[in-house]
Amino acid sequence: MKYPLDCEENFEKSFLFWLAKYVKFKLNSLSNKELKNPQALAEVNFALTKGVKNIDELDALAKKARNAGLSGVNTYFNPLKKVFEYLNFYKLYSLKQIDEELIVEVLASITGALSDASKKNYRIAVINFFDFLDKQNEEDEKAHIFDINLKNWAGIAGSKGVKLPEFMSKEELKKFLDAIENADFKNNTIRNKLIIKIIIFTGIRVSEAINIKMGDISEENDLYIIRIRAKGNKYRVVMIKKELIYDLLKNVSINYISKDALLFVNKKGTPLTQSYVSRIVEQLLFRAGIRKQKNGAHMLRHTFATLLYKKQKDLVLVQEALGHASLNTSRIYTHFDNDKLKLAAQVAKELSDS
């Protein structure tokens, strides 16, 4: 069903109406391969069909959908929430007043301090949202076309603006591992230690770790082989030395009867969330006295990849270990190769001496 663009009594309510429609559209078009709680998703869809009263209510529904397993919804909703809040300062009376020039002005204000990767997320979300509006609004058998493409938005610096990921040094990693050994998470100590160790020693994504099932783990001599459901419904395997997690895995597996059961769940039997795992990492970093700009669990993956490349100098190995589709994605970790920088400095000195 199509609706007039200015379907509510004022700009704010009309924009909120369309944003809720868009979120509902994304919930039912994004990949649901990681969906863990269909009932929760059904409840969110029902609530969106009834309509929301304010942006906070819509925010809560988006978070509920993410916790149900549709993590991609926040990639679209969070940037649009910021745009919505900022546009309200302009005191517009109609959505038809929005044009590309205004959107560029808004994005310049709210993304100035963000990385290029985050700016690209904003660009994708904004273009996708207004494309949705182009196709869904109709009044007197005509649609208002925004045609927002942001081709000339200068907010993204390109390849030279790549931001290097945060990672721990070997010394910091030792402190972090000591913090794991001494950590006390009450009834969740064994489970929490196990998931963090698997991530840091294999470099898998948090989304991959929380979806590991008992049946995904097999043994081969002194190794555990873990079958991972990766991006794009693809599968790969990672390996970890038994001695690193043997006791923890043995204690956790005692409580599992079915090999189809997820390894990491809470006391209600529902899967752990990515945000929960990141909070564990933040606590451990704090206890270890390690301060980083980004303290989330993804930093463990960057640490694994960086130290692996520094040790082996093998970019293909990093690509295979991390499950990157492209070698260019793995190339970011070569920026931390001080040996190459020292060699360049030596060559420069030799040139000056000649």
Curated annotation (Swiss-Prot):
Which stretches make up the Core-binding (CB) domain? 48-134
The organism's place on the tree of life at top rank: Bacteria
Query: What cellular-component terms does GO give this entry?
Result: cytoplasm
Query: Which GO terms of the molecular function aspect are on file?
Result: DNA binding; tyrosine-based site-specific recombinase activity
Q: What is its main location?
A: cytoplasm
Q: Where is the active site?
A: R205, K231, H298, R301, H324, Y333
Could you say how this protein's activity is regulated?
Answer: FtsK is required for efficient recombination.
Location of this chain's protein in the cell: Cytoplasm
The record, for Gene3D superfamilies, names: Intergrase catalytic core
For this UniProt record, give its keywords in alphabetical order, as a comma-separated list: Cell cycle, Cell division, Cytoplasm, DNA integration, DNA recombination, DNA-binding
What positions does the domain Tyr recombinase occupy? Answer: 163-346
Q: Which GO terms describe its biological process?
A: cell division; DNA recombination
Q: Which family does it belong to?
A: Belongs to the 'phage' integrase family. XerH subfamily.
Q: What does this protein do?
A: Site-specific tyrosine recombinase, which acts by catalyzing the cutting and rejoining of the recombining DNA molecules. Binds to the complete atypical dif motif (difH) site and to both halves separately.
**Record-given protein name:** Tyrosine recombinase XerH
